[in-house]
């Protein structure tokens, strides 16, 4: 026994938490839930409270006293079974031990609480209090008094936990609360309640034991009762452990919720912001914001409805957040003015090739680039705008922009002149000055850029260079040969004649212009072309005008598109990490297809990108509303009749084609019919397009895009017309044809005969029966007639019955008599009345 006591003392002094000498696990086990709860608290602990040394010494004294009891019990055991303690003596001893433990526990909890308050400040502390289960293990009588007393010592050690030197404290972010004091009270109350429950169980067991002792049953032993009591005790332990864990989880969830509710955010508020955006910026639910607006009197508010800055500020303050009013216009100005004070460095010239359709612009570029783009164009006509960069000797670079020459691509040519430094005007030597040539000259003058004239196809026998220069003079373009400043270079793209001279002229012009740009700043530039690729998504061709564009930058394009640059490719299709000024690149990563000619700029973050997009979208919507209002006012002034409408859904391969076709068909106007483009977009025809066309009674115009088999089948079922085109000429001509078929023909009345009235046979409600003589032309049954008296039309009608003698006939020629029936019941005067026979001729109208 002394060896056991020494082992206990050494274990306590060394700080170990396990007592293999006392065999705790043999009699009473902590439930798995308590162990998990303890591990959870230890892992999440923030601060550590050391157990006072006085407490450790007191616990050692308690164990020593228990050891003395153990020694005394062993004395009883040595005397034999006749000296075994009675049940009443065991109950009295256990009650005394429990009362002592309760008194000691109160002092320990009070001391621990004092230490916690001194060590942990401004934090909520939750102590890992040992589970108090005053189990009367004396009742587990299996092998004698020695084992019963051993269980008493084991329970005392578990309750007091003398070797637990570190109690972990969970710090909650909401600050201290009243859980510390409450835990102390709850621990004592639980201990007292547990004691009362166990006393009742002991009394019940004592009564049953006395009854069994007085009338014992065969086969029933004390061992069976001990197992029963042990099972009841373990069930009570498990229930209490579950309750403790549930209380801890509830307290944790409540703590996390309160922390979240107390987070204060700084919200940026523009001039206008939607309800959904405001809720997102505050990290609040949209429903909560709607409820707040409902209380303010805003009923039927939707997530996409706009709020002004004043309303948004009130909402932010109501949710205990702070706000800052921002001017997005100033933000955009600051972005574009960033880096203007940095050093300017030379850059490559941007050259736009312009001219009339089929004058050899793309072929000339192919000859310069030594490529073959023209053969890839349908029917040799450029349908898209393209950007390329070539490297000459000495690492000199020239960026070329190829624009379509068809009249429909006016917007593209205007876009080309806005980003260019030099314009190469291509004029065919055999055709001379053409309409799009004149238009290109006007664009150059409006943009105030330098121009070089390239007279192409000089290898033809009918080429006349002097005629070209004189024709240019009529449009204000004076060649150097005539004393002007415009360089005229005769070239042949087919035979590659004078191409080096054209390159040299471009480089010379670039040196005279002293083209420079800032490299070390945020990138900005212009969109040349954009489209949707089935493999890559949105692809936009950009030209950097300022700064350096890098892969990974976040850019804002126009009023509807932004994104992170996932990848860039140069004009040769190679991956590009950076793009410097004057370099054209294809960019992947935008969320929407931007319009050609839209500007782009690099921003710091996606949040800033969304703010800038919202501001630009607000301006764009305001302009649309203004235009719609002006159109409505104009229609009210005209007060025109309702006209027929042709609804169109336009799908193209690139955004430039969309704009060009919209521009072209907008010029097709007629007073009796109206053309509406309900939807325009980039990409293949989809099922949504077909359903929209069915609902709106529209036709689908597909330019250089396809429709898969499922879409075609759906269109056939819904009777939706899908027209495919590859050349812009065809789509414009087809739209004119469709519009012409919708026009009502013009009706014109032509006199084809005349009748002289010889006799009136009868006149009444059924009509008038007249005997007539055909003086001219031919009279047919059902012909339109006019009854004229003194040069005044008194009746218009049709010939119901036409007869010769008694026979019905279809027509009567000039010089013959006939009888007719008119639906006219008033009096007719044969002497003065005449009848003119008319025929209605319809004239089909065609939109040109």
Swiss-Prot record:
MF terms (GO), sorted A to Z: GTP binding; GTPase activity; translation initiation factor activity
InterPro entries: EF-G-like_DII (IPR053905), IF2_II (IPR044145), IF2_N (IPR006847), P-loop_NTPase (IPR027417), Small_GTP-bd (IPR005225), T_Tr_GTP-bd_dom (IPR000795), TF_IF2_bacterial-like (IPR000178), TIF_IF2 (IPR015760)
Binding site for GTP: 355-362, 402-406, 456-459
Chain intervals for the UniProt region annotation (G3): 402-405
G4, as annotated region: 456-459
Keyword Thylakoid: no
Database matches in Gene3D superfamilies: P-loop containing nucleotide triphosphate hydrolases, Translation factors, Translation initiation factor IF- 2, domain 3
Keywords: Cytoplasm, GTP-binding, Initiation factor, Nucleotide-binding, Protein biosynthesis
Location in or out of the cell: Cytoplasm
This protein's GO CC annotations: cytoplasm
Region (G5): 492-494
Positions of region (G2): 380-384
Domain tr-type G: 346-516
G1: annotated span: 355-362
Keyword Cytoplasm on entry: yes
Region annotated Disordered, chain positions: 1-20
Protein family membership: Belongs to the TRAFAC class translation factor GTPase superfamily. Classic translation factor GTPase family. IF-2 subfamily.
Its biological purpose: One of the essential components for the initiation of protein synthesis. Protects formylmethionyl-tRNA from spontaneous hydrolysis and promotes its binding to the 30S ribosomal subunits. Also involved in the hydrolysis of GTP during the formation of the 70S ribosomal complex.
Protein name: Translation initiation factor IF-2
Phylogenetic placement of the source organism: Bacteria, Pseudomonadati, Pseudomonadota, Alphaproteobacteria, Rickettsiales
